[in-house]
A protein has these predicted regions:
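Adenine-nucleotide phosphate-binding core of ATP-dependent small-molecule kinases
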Residues: 32-86
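Glycine-rich phosphate-binding loops at beta-strand->alpha-helix junctions
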Residues: 89-108
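Glycine-rich phosphate-binding loop plus the immediately following alpha-helix
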Residues: 1-46, 54
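Short, surface-exposed connector motifs at secondary-structure boundaries
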Residues: 85-92, 114-117
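A glycine- and small-aliphatic-rich helix-loop capping segment at beta-alpha/alpha-beta transitions
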Residues: 107-116, 141-143
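Active-site proximal loops enriched in glycine and acidic residues that flank catalytic Cys/His/Asp
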Residues: 56, 93-97, 122
């Protein structure tokens, strides 16, 4: 998938394997490089889209390129999903903290709005989603999912 403020997104597997076995990094360091120190953090030293926009506004061409690459990857992922949905897409909804960036959301909109209606709902609602899921389990509407055999690195 696309890179995000702190996650790398898709990577070339061969290069990743070489890096893992280079002896330069511990397992914990590699995990942090992929999630936490990847994405915008790896490229620009920040996970804050507002800071990236300030860099762009100040004429930083690298920041502009990285932000455009992020928009491109997001749009590409949306296009891939539209394909497997056989074009039956009701709407495209941009969410999360980066959705506060009009620059980013407008770039994505330009590339994908032909697929379906496009809307932006900025912010993160992970805690609300967890709470609502818990209520559904407590009300007997869903069964709790137990992840006993998840992969541990």
């Amino acid at each position: 998938g696309p890179f995000s403020p702190e996650r790398t997104g898709g990577l070339p597997c061969g290069d990743l394997v070489k890096l893992c076995f280079s002896g330069k990094y511990t397992l914990a360091e590699m995990k942090k490089k992929i999630s936490g120190k990847g994405g915008l953090v790896a490229y620009l030293g920040t996970n804050d889209a507002r800071e990236v926009q300030k860099l762009i506004d100040a004429g930083d061409e690298k920041a502009k390129l990285i932000f455009s690459a992020m928009a491109y990857q997001i749009a590409k992922e949306i296009g891939q999903m539209a394909t497997v949905l056989k074009g039956e897409v009701d709407a495209i909804v941009m969410t999360g903290g980066v959705s506060y960036s009009e620059n980013l959301t407008n770039q994505v909109k330009e590339m994908v709005s032909f697929i379906a209606p496009y809307m932006v709902i900025p912010g993160e609602d992970e805690m609300l989603a967890l709470a609502e899921g818990t209520v559904r389990v407590l009300n007997g509407e869903e069964k709790a999912k137990i992840y006993e055999n998840e992969v541990k690195l």
